[in-house]
Amino acid sequence: MDHRDFLTRFLDASCEAMDAFAADEAARETLIRMGEDVCTSIRNGGKLLIAGNGGSAADAQHIAAEFVSRLMYDRAPLPALALTTDSSALTAIGNDYGYEHVFERQVTGLGQKGDVFLGISTSGRSPNVIRALHAAREKGIITFGFTGVAGNAMTELCDRLLLAPSPQTAIIQQIHITAAHMLCAVVERTLFPVEGR
């Protein structure tokens, strides 16, 4: 089997979506506003909570790691927590209440007013992410969403929403992690400014 044509088409679709994202002024403004919200939260003693499923769960952990460790240069750790990492909590909640509650209960138990919650769902329809967004709003937590489909259930639940311009899950995920790096960079540059960076 010759994979060359498929790989060329995949790369073309990836580049096309990334070009569309790069040209989207509104997306950049959204990321800047998200960064400002995260900075305000952290300055006031808050934190960033992040959740998603599958590849988006890995993205949640990746994002939290960039905040707690570093992205572009050495600086103090920033408070971020992926709600996808505690296997005991995930399996207890999933077993006792149902998988759709695994993030909702963590947001309710760990989140505080003024925190930020980022829900990641390529489809915008993940029940556990939707429930977590509802729980966050009830607690006065600022709600962000990364998704790939306009007009989905996350639209009404997110204070700030970033849409990846592709119908393909893998390419949506590529844009999400790029956006996450941009978000972290905005926060890092704001809270720990370094001349020339």
UniProtKB/Swiss-Prot annotation:
Reaction catalysis annotation: 2 D-sedoheptulose 7-phosphate = D-glycero-alpha-D-manno-heptose 7-phosphate + D-glycero-beta-D-manno-heptose 7-phosphate
Keywords: Carbohydrate metabolism, Cytoplasm, Isomerase, Metal-binding, Zinc
Stated family: Belongs to the SIS family. GmhA subfamily.
GO biological process: carbohydrate metabolic process; D-glycero-D-manno-heptose 7-phosphate biosynthetic process
Cofactor requirement: Zn(2+)
Misc. comment: The reaction produces a racemic mixture of D-glycero-alpha-D-manno-heptose 7-phosphate and D-glycero-beta-D-manno-heptose 7-phosphate.
Name the UniProt record assigns to this protein: Phosphoheptose isomerase
Any single GO CC term annotated in Swiss-Prot or TrEMBL for this entry: cytoplasm
Protein's job: Catalyzes the isomerization of sedoheptulose 7-phosphate in D-glycero-D-manno-heptose 7-phosphate.
EC numbers, comma separated: 5.3.1.28
InterPro entries according to UniProt: GmhA/DiaA, Phosphoheptose_Isoase, SIS_dom, SIS_dom_sf, SIS_GmhA/DiaA_subfam
Enzyme class: isomerase
Domain SIS: 38-197
